[in-house]
């Protein structure tokens, strides 16, 4: 343990916090700093040139990362009839309607993503105070309220991540695990940045991508030279 702490301390001293590193170097440094006993997540923070106080400059959506996120995602679906069977066939872990709502009210929430068909929102709407604070409330903007229940389930299972600007105009998102290769992490990062570019508000002026940094769960943050990401 002492050797790990010493190694991490040396790595932190090696990183220049004021420097923008080429993306491959930045990701390698972050991987090297992930010395915890578990497979740490690799996260990105993107400072966007938006005014988060204005509703028309909110950046929110979802993207399927090509290399996944390195974890098994449990999906719960609110649907009935044919859609319920389609959800099961697509790989949903939990499918229900009023019974699923009752389970959630009772505290049974063994899932990571909640999907609902549009007609189910009359039931799901009653769960806002439970699902909302946990970031689980279905929303059409991120594809979790959809008539295409098969596509929604498959996207969630394939490693879809949701993104949303916080009060400071920053998007925080996981792009993989420390066990991922640098190439796979870069591919996921590029997919996220492409999605953010497509979601750029028309009212956003000036520089859109202001700053980009990557970090691991327990490690250090490293700033990335944005010009190197597309290289």
Swiss-Prot record:
CDD domains the UniProt entry points to: Ribosomal_L1
A Gene Ontology biological process term: translation
Superkingdom per UniProt: Bacteria
GO molecular function: rRNA binding; structural constituent of ribosome; tRNA binding
Keywords: Repressor, Ribonucleoprotein, Ribosomal protein, RNA-binding, rRNA-binding, Translation regulation, tRNA-binding
Keyword Lyase: no
GO CC terms, sorted: cytosolic large ribosomal subunit
The family this protein is said to belong to: Belongs to the universal ribosomal protein uL1 family.
Function: Binds directly to 23S rRNA. The L1 stalk is quite mobile in the ribosome, and is involved in E site tRNA release. Protein L1 is also a translational repressor protein, it controls the translation of the L11 operon by binding to its mRNA.
Assembly information from the UniProt record: Part of the 50S ribosomal subunit.
Protein's UniProt name: Large ribosomal subunit protein uL1
Organism: Thiobacillus denitrificans (strain ATCC 25259 / T1)
């Amino acid at each position: 343990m002492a050797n790990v702490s010493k190694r991490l301390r040396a790595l932190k001293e090696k990183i220049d916090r004021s420097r923008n590193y080429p993306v491959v170097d930045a990701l390698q440094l972050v991987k090297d700093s992930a010395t915890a006993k578990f497979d740490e997540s690799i996260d990105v923070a993107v400072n966007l040139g938006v005014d988060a106080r204005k509703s028309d400059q909110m950046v929110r959506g979802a993207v399927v990362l090509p290399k996944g996120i390195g974890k098994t995602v449990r999906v719960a679906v609110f649907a009935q009839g044919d859609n319920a069977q389609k959800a099961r066939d697509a790989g949903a872990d939990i499918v229900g309607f009023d019974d699923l709502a009752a389970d959630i009210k009772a505290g049974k929430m063994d899932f990571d993503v909640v999907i609902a068909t549009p007609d189910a929102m009359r039931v799901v709407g009653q769960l806002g105070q439970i699902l909302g604070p946990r970031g689980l409330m279905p929303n059409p903007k991120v594809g979790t309220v959809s008539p295409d229940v098969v596509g929604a389930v498959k996207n969630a299972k394939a490693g879809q991540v949701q993104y949303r600007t916080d009060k400071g105009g920053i998007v925080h998102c996981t792009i993989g695990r420390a066990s991922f290769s640098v190439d796979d992490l870069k591919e996921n990062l590029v997919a996220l940045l492409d999605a953010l570019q497509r979601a750029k508000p028309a009212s956003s002026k000036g520089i859109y991508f202001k700053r980009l940094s990557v970090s691991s769960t327990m490690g250090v943050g490293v700033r990335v030279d944005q010009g190197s990401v597309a290289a």
